Amino acid sequence: MYHFVYETTNLINGKKYIGKHSTDDLNDGYLGSGKAIQQAIKKYGENNFSRTILKEFKTSEEAYMYEEEIITPELIKSKNYYNMKPGGIGGIVMTTDVIAKMKESSAKRFENSPGTVLGKTCYTNGTKNIFIKPGELVPEGFVKGMVHPNRKSRKGCKVKPTTTGTFWVNNGAINKLIQPDGIIPDGFIKGRLMKRDSKGKFSKA
C-alpha cells in the first residue's frame, strides 16, 4: 500500500488542490474527493487535470499529519486552491482529538514493529538494514534510509528497493529522485510529475 500527499492542478486555470491518498495502484487516476475539486473536474473534464505526488509515507497516519501541516488557513483562503477546510479530505475538519489519536497509533505501530527501536535511525547498505543510536558511528558503506528487498507489487513481482527519506523533484518534464541530504538541482522543484494516458490512468512522466 502506498500512502502519499499529492497536489492536483487544473491545467486550464492553474488552480490546485492538496490531499492525502492511500492506494495499491499509483496509476489509479485519483484526483481528489473534496467538493470543490469534484465540481471543477466535472466542469473541465479529468483530462484537464494533472496530479503530482508531493511526499510519500510509510503509514496513512503520517500522511494525514503532513497534510494537516501544509493545508494552512492562508492556503484555504487563497483563490488559487480548491481546498475548503483544514485536512483537505473532502472538506472534513480533523479535530485535535483525532490528530492526537493518530499520532498515538503511529507511535505504537512504530514501537511494536519488528526490528525497529524508537530513538534510533535506520541505515542501509542496499541489502541490510541496521539501527544506530544518536552519536554512534555509522559503518562504512551504510547510508540513512531503509531498503525493502521483499516488497511485492500487485502482480507479484519484486519492487526495486526503496529508501526512506528520499524525495522527488521535477523540472516540468523530467522526474529525479533526491537523497535525504541531497541538493535540488537548478530549475527543479519538489514533486513528482504524473501523466494521464488515454484510459484516464496516471503514469510516470
Curated annotation (Swiss-Prot):
Q: Which GO MF terms does the UniProt record name?
A: endonuclease activity
User: Which top class of enzyme applies to this chain?
Assistant: hydrolase
Specify the GIY-YIG domain's residue ranges.
1-84
Q: SUPFAM superfamilies of this UniProt entry?
A: GIY-YIG endonuclease
> Pfam families from the entry?
SegE_GIY-YIG
Keywords noted in UniProt: Endonuclease, Hydrolase, Magnesium, Nuclease
The record's annotation in CDD domains points to: GIY-YIG_SegABCDEFG
Record-stated family: To endonucleases of group I introns of fungi and phage.
Q: What does this protein do?
A: Probably involved in the movement of the endonuclease-encoding DNA.
The entry's protein name is Putative endonuclease segE
- The species this protein belongs to is Enterobacteria phage T4
